[in-house]
Amino acid sequence: MKRCGLLGEKLGHSYSPAIHAELADYEYRLYEVAPEKLGEFLTSGGFDGMNVTIPYKKAVIPYCAELSPIAQKLQSVNVLVRRKDGTLYGDNADAYGFAGMVRASGIQIDGKKTLVLGSGGASSTVHAVLEEMGARSVTIISRKGEDNYNNLDRHADAEVIVNTTPVGMYPNCGVSPVDLSLFPKLEGVLDIVYNPARTAFVLQAEKLGIPYMSGLYMLVAQAKRTAEVFENRDIPDSETERIWKKLSLEMQNIVLVGMPGSGKSTVAARLAEKLDRIALDSDAEVEEKNGATCAQLIEKYGEAEFRKLESEAIAALGKRSGAVIATGGGCVTREENYDLLHQNGIILFI
């Protein structure tokens, strides 16, 4: 069996092993490697294929005997293959993945004024793809460049915005790199972040009625391309769509809201059992964190303060994935709770 995986400095939780398990029959593990150990890891011969993530997409290039044309152009490698002679071949599947994400979103790029938020490695990849798709202009927005977050008014006529920054990514959910209401001509929003499923950036797009897409499709599409390189065979494009839909459903929380006494906790427990998911309860979370019952907390602090404690609990639960969440009857009285619960979930009233 081929030995493959994901190389990075700090990886934490990753969906990549689950995606690759759907695509092919090879071992796929996570490899956290310190910068001073990178050369030793790459030359040891201990793997057949490897995805590469930050901060090593450029650092691995000197160890490659050959680069694909796209990797050479972007000077960014996120796929390594060990050839029969032991040398490494470097490729880039991120461009393929982002292009697939754009096509799946239905957002038109040809002839549009586009903004790319962020100036890191992903930014250059996105820039190249947008140009190839015929964007009228592509402007990089960075913190310190000529075009930055302090002069966004220069680009109020932007039609498509792509976020390539980690702003809003788990666990620092709930923040957005820009206020989309500043762009009255906006026609599409793309965010390469995939956890949470809906960042604050795309949640605002949803509220404004602007078409959007999050980064999970890109992750699956680039994994499909990676598997093709690892296996030296074609994989149908339909596999990307299938795996994306499957993961989207599995990752999505089912959130129950309703009047007190409507049976949310009971229904959540039964649903979780039927669907083989974990059942979570915001009231139970509040009580566990504060060492008292909800009734006692309301009596001690008043309802307004209790609702703040409830929102803190909901913020923690809303970051989870693949759960059934029962909420307190009054959670709908605080508007902020909607985004906290919807970022990873579908909300059902019972």
State where each predicted segment sits.
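Conserved phosphate-donor/acceptor-positioning beta-strand/loop module used by diverse small-molecule
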Residues: L341-I350
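Rossmann-like adenosine-cofactor binding region
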Residues: D147-M213, C331-Y338
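Walker A/P-loop
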Residues: S265
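NAD(P)-binding Rossmann-fold cofactor-contacting core
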Residues: M133-Y149, D283-E285, K289-N290
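Phosphate/diphosphate ligand-binding glycine-rich loop within oxidoreductases
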Residues: K2-S105, P196-R198, L208, Y217-V220
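Glycine-rich adenosine-cofactor-binding loop
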Residues: G8, N92-A95, V102, I107, ...
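Adenosine-phosphate binding glycine-rich loop
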Residues: I192-Q252
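ATP-dependent small-molecule kinase phosphotransfer cores
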Residues: A284-H342
